């Protein structure tokens, strides 16, 4: 089982905004873990005037996704509808299976079982989580386009005791904690 530690270092955040940011970050990450079937034991969020920190322990290192059947359009639907389904699911026409149901004959596709590394999933989820924090007032600073509650200076991220590499706007993660 693995651990994940995220620390966002910024200029001073007022106490009420810290509470809201903690709550929002925790909710977003918990929902994302649930959507992606990522198991964990405990997820805690802390804050101080200059830091917002998330710690998750006993994370699965891989997520196993089972094969499943996905229902598509009805057999006899316009070709345009069928092509849209094929494109959306990134399959070819030969992958389609016709099956009879209570409501008629439909096209289905069968997905393959696969494993996703938790590290790869975190690289997608965490930037979205940071971006999604709702601030009552956001500010832009320097020549960056990032709008955030206070100027964000650094992102520390470690998964399973290794640096978790991702980029959020102009910032790249690092594995050094800033002490001031």
Residues covered by each model-derived region:
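Long, basic N-terminal domains or extensions that often function
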Residues: 1-180
């Amino acid at each position: 089982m693995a651990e994940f530690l995220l620390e966002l270092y910024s200029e001073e955040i007022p106490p009420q905004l810290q509470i809201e940011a903690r709550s929002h970050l925790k909710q977003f990450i918990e929902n994302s873990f649930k959507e992606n079937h990522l198991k964990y034991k405990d997820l805690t969020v802390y804050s101080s005037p200059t830091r917002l920190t998330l710690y998750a322990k006993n994370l699965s290192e891989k997520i196993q996704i089972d094969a499943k059947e996905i229902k598509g359009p009805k057999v006899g639907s316009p070709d345009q509808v069928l092509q849209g389904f094929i494109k959306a699911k990134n399959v070819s026409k030969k992958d389609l299976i016709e099956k009879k149901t209570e409501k008629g004959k439909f096209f289905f596709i069968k997905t393959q079982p696969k494993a996703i590394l938790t590290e790869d999933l975190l690289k997608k989820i965490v930037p979205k989580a940071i971006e999604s924090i709702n601030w009552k007032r956001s500010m832009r600073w320097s020549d960056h386009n990032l709008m955030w509650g206070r100027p964000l200076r650094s992102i520390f991220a470690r998964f399973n005791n290794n640096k978790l590499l991702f980029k959020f706007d102009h910032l790249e993660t690092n594995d050094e904690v800033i002490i001031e």
